[in-house]
Every structure is written in C-alpha cells, then in structure tokens.
C-alpha cells in the first residue's frame, strides 16, 4: 500500500510567499522515493471505482516528471530527480512492493486527482498517500488520452505528481498555507494552479478549454522547481558538463546536446530549465526573429511570438523558456553563453562569465554585472565604426553585420587583427547623440522574484561575440 511504512515529515514555511504558496505542509523523508504503475485494483484493496492500467504515453509522461534514469538522457534534467537531490526508483508495473507513489486510471474520473498527499494531509489513512489517478476522460480536452509534452494529459502527469511530492494548488489557501500572490498565480510560474493566466478564474473549466491544445506547460515551472528544491535539495550533477540547449522555429522540441529533451506535442515552446553546472549555452542560431535572450535567474527568453503559449482569451505566455532560480545563491545553475540569430536581438547577461554571439542584425548587449565585460568581433578593427555616448553606451557599426549597442562593456576585441580596445580609452569617431532602441523585455525578472535571487560577490567576465 502506497503510504504505509513510508516516512514523511512536516514541511516548514520558507518565508518566501512564492514558495510557500505551493507547499502543502508535508513531504517524503526516505532516502529513495519509489514509484510504480499498478496492474490491477488488487493493489489498492477497497476502492469505489473501476480500474485501468496506464497507457505507454502516460507512463512516459510520469517517467519524464519523476525519473532521471527511465527516460532519454536528454530529458533527465527536467525531471524531479534531475533538479532535486532526491533519489527516485521505478519499481515497475506491479501490484507488489511499497511504492511511495502509485499510478492508475479511474475511467469514471474527469481529469486527474491524488488520493492524499505525503503525511496523510487529507486524513483518509496513510495507505492511499501518494496514489495518483489519471481520469479516463477529459471533458475539457477531448477524448484523446495520448500524453505528450504540452498537451492536457501531459499536464495532468506533472500536476498530480506535484501533489504526490508535497505540492498544493497555487490558487488556494490550504492546510495553513496561503495561495500564491496574485501576479505569480498562472501557468507561467507553476503547473500547480488552476489559473491559466494571471487573473483568470480557477473555478470553471472555461479557461482550461480556451488554452491551446498543445499550450500547457511542458515541464515543472519556476515555483514548482523552487518549492521542490526547498523540500528535497538541488541536484548539481545532472548536465554538470558543458551543455548546449537549442531550439528551432519550426518545432516545439527542446534539444539537449543535439538530442530531443522535450518531445513537444506541437510548435509551442513553454518550459523552465535547470542546469547542474558546466559552461552552458542557449543556441538560437536557427532563428531570424528578433530574439530577447535573458540569462538572469527567473528571467524569460522570447524566441518567436508564434511559439508562445496561448493561455486563454487574448493572453499569451511572457516567454518561451524560463530560467530556474539559483539554489541558495549557487551559481553553477546559471547559463553562461547565448548564440543569437539573424534578427535584431537583445541579450541580457547574468553574474556568470558570459559569452554572447550576436550574429547578424542590430543587436543590443547588456553585460550586467562584472568588472571586465567583453565584446568580440570576428572582423578587423578598420571594418567597424565605434561611437561613444554620454550615457556610457557604445554603438559599433558594420556595413553588412549591422549596428550593435553595447552597455556595461569594458573591452572590445577584434579577433582578425587581435586588436583589444579599452572602452574607457575610446573616443567617438563621429560625434552623434545617444542612439537608443526601446526593447520590450518580457520575462520573469520581476520585482516579485527578487526575494529569491541570491548572487555571488565575485566579479565575472562577460564575453560577447558576433
């Protein structure tokens, strides 16, 4: 029986309302969390509804949500085991054993549910703690039960697994824990809320029905990851080497070192990324759109408006990919490098040693923090015109490659002639007023997130290449 004999502990408040808003008040406290796919109703003793086994796609969705070992290696970092320090073990398709979390289908259920949380919160007895049920029907998402990243059945796997690990609904006050703050209560922040967009109603099916068929979150989102790491610690061993994450405009898939890590049901990209360490890259070289690439913790990057999630009515997600928060200020999870495309791209660095490749277009580079931020160009010095402005920014122009704006940059390097320029020594080659281009950077680096950002005092070096 699921909860019998498995140890749970009380979850104390973190003091951060964005984390506490999804905590239920208890979580598992065993060295290994075991899960299984039940084969019959006999696994449960006395249940008051019919039973069916999961199909292969639902099993794959559960593996993606929980295990770093059961799915493709490229998917490991998106799983609970991949971003927390908690070990997870799959017991198999069985009615035996003492799994913490068991999965089955209730063909009469519309949606999904968990029988009880860790710690017997509902109070029905510990035997059903962690039992997850997929519904045999979804009146709000059609009759298809095939789960794939971004569709409703995939979302159920993430949402109900979150409950089984110790997360509550973000939109509800429950068990002494308040709901999420209004501005962070949506799918952009958590899979645990019923609010698809900020301000939507959590009490009707209407908004769910308006979400695009492939527009649900593809992974646990920022607040889910932060809350689960608060309870179970963080994993810095998954993708701890140099990892390249890439995307294309004609697919919703996320590629990890060239392999599919998120096999999307459609063209939408809607996920949060945690990385364990190494020198890591966001590669957007396939795009010709005007990219907004934000590497800050909690920040969001926009690759293509056509690939933004439709969250109901006229509301779309604020980004395609979001960065997880740092865990206790540890910089190993930061992304260090970004490669732009052929559009007019905007890059925002973090506190790591950043390297940016701009590509074509009129790009904007903001080095952020650091004492020695660099921009490197492949051409010779004489091919570029540099203007310095009263606000400290620079514009670097090339007849073919475009005009770039440099902010918080200390050195410019022209690799062909190995010329190194100190920005403090640069005088404008032509006297011009400040050139400014307003960038609408829409992401999650909002004031509401600042309380969870912890930064190191070290002064990094940011390198920008074009």
Question: Where do the protein language model's features map onto the residues?
Answer:
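RTX-like calcium-binding, glycine/aspartate-rich low-complexity repeat tracts
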Residues: 1-364, 368-466
């Amino acid at each position: 029986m699921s909860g019998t004999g498995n140890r749970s502990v009380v979850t104390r408040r973190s003091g951060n309302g964005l984390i506490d808003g999804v905590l239920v008040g208890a979580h598992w406290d065993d060295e290994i969390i075991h899960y299984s796919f039940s084969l019959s109703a006999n696994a449960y003793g006395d249940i008051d509804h019919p039973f069916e086994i999961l199909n292969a796609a639902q099993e794959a969705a559960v593996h993606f949500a929980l295990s770093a070992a059961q799915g493709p290696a490229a998917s490991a970092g998106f799983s609970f085991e991949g971003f927390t320090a908690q070990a997870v073990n799959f017991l198999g398709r069985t009615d035996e054993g003492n799994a913490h979390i068991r999965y089955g289908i209730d063909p009469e259920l519309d949606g999904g549910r968990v029988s009880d949380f860790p710690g017997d919160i509902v109070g029905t007895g510990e035997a059903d703690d962690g039992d997850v049920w997929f519904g045999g029907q979804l009146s709000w998402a059609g009759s298809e039960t095939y789960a794939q990243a971004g569709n409703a059945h995939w979302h159920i796997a993430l949402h109900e697994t979150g409950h089984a690990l110790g997360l509550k609904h973000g939109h509800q006050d429950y068990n002494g824990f308040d709901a999420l703050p209004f501005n962070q209560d949506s799918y952009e922040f958590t899979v645990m809320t019923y609010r698809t967009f900020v301000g939507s109603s959590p009490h009707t099916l209407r908004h769910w029905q308006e979400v695009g068929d492939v527009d649900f979150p593809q992974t646990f989102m920022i607040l889910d990851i932060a809350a689960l790491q608060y309870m179970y610690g963080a994993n810095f061993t998954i993708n701890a080497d140099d990892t390249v994450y890439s995307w294309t405009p004609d697919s919703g898939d996320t590629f990890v070192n060239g392999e599919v890590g998120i096999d999307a049901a459609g063209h939408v990209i809607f996920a949060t990324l945690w990385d364990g360490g190494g020198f890591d890259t966001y590669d957007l070289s396939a795009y010709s759109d005007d990219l907004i690439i934000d590497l800050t913790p909690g920040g969001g990057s926009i690759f293509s408006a056509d690939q933004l999630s439709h969250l109901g009515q006229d509301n779309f997600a604020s980004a395609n990919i979001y960065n997880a928060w740092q865990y206790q200020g540890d910089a190993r999870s930061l992304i260090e490098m970004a490669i732009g495309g052929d559009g007019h791209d905007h890059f925002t660095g973090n506190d790591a040693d950043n390297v940016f490749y701009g590509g074509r277009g009129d790009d904007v580079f903001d080095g952020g923090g650091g004492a020695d931020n660099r921009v490197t160009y492949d051409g010779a010095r004489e091919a570029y015109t540099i203007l310095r402005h009263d606000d400290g920014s620079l514009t670097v122009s090339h007849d073919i490659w475009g005009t770039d704006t440099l902010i918080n940059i200390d050195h410019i390097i022209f690799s062909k002639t190995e010329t190194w320029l100190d920005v403090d020594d640069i005088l404008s080659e032509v006297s011009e007023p400040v050139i400014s281009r307003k960038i609408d950077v829409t992401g999650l680096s909002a004031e509401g997130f600042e309380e969870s950002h912890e930064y190191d005092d070290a002064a990094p070096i940011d390198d920008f290449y074009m």
